[in-house]
Amino acid sequence: MNGVPLCQDIWIAPFTAFGYGYFDEIPAAYVLKYLDFETAMYFVNKNLWTWIDGTQSIYECVNNRLKHPARLNVKIEKVTRENGKVQVYIDGKMEEYDAIIVTSPLQYLPDYFDATAKEKELFSKIDYERYDVTAITIKKGSYYPEMSSYIFDNMQPERLGHMMVFYLRWKNEPNQVISTYILRNHKGKELIDYETGKKMAWEDLKTCGVDIDKCVYERKWYYFPHVFEKDYAAGWYDKVEAMQGNLNTYYAGEIMSFGDMEETVQYSKDLVARYF
């Protein structure tokens, strides 16, 4: 932390435990974009809240008000850019557009786009966090935690794969599920496989005195796409921004801002203001 270790004490829980990686591998610009003074103070003062119906409900409500709502569960087979237009192939049919804004993971864009050499080069630099969650119930009559808890000792690369936080979503709601969160990857270490990571999280819960009944949900995420410090310093973002509009293609989504809702939405609004 450049000789300022107290910053790590303030930032490590909302950054590393929230799945954004370790401070020795993630460029500081990402940390500062997310944990600006206002956001950091929310965590310090415990001024936090959640959406009662989950964040997906926000997008569902927005989508219901759109003139052209999102088309869900559509498989895009390929995208070509020819004759000043963009051709999108869906279920064997071609739809042609004036331009396209890509918000899906850019590192996979070459899999279905007629990607240029520059797109392939830049987007191959992207990595992401393997951030896993399980939701478990506790055996009746056994110990039940009163509140969510961080395990700060597990937020270091040396404890990769161990549970960093367990979470109780609702206040005064006995016997609700408990969610566990782990990271399985670090730039300088071997990737921990999914099943091993899950087992480590549950062993940590047992160490905390929790007697697991069953797992009711589990998920591994494509989480927080980013580039590492060498590519960041070499101007990765400047190079991608310089491509905006080429072949009627624009790039947005998490990688162009940060892996949370606010920064992603702000970038999207800025992109539209600049080019449309």
Task: Please annotate each region the language model reported.
Residues 1-80:
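Active-site/ligand-binding neighborhood in enzyme catalytic cores
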Residues 254:
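Active-site glycine-centered loops adjacent to acidic/histidine catalytic or metal-binding residues
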Residues 70-72, 102, 251:
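A structural signal for the hydrophobic beta-strands that form the central parallel beta-sheet
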Residues 97-99, 108-238, 248, 258-262, ...:
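C-terminal segments that line or cap access tunnels to active or ligand-binding sites in enzymes
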Residues 90, 103-104:
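Short, well-ordered coil/turn residues at beta-beta hairpins
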Residues 78, 107-108:
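Glycine-rich nucleotide phosphate-binding loop and flanking beta-alpha elements
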Residues 264-276:
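Internal hydrophobic alpha-helix adjacent to the cofactor/substrate pocket in enzyme cavities
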Residues 77-95:
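Conserved beta-strand-loop-beta-strand element in the redox core of flavoprotein oxidoreductases
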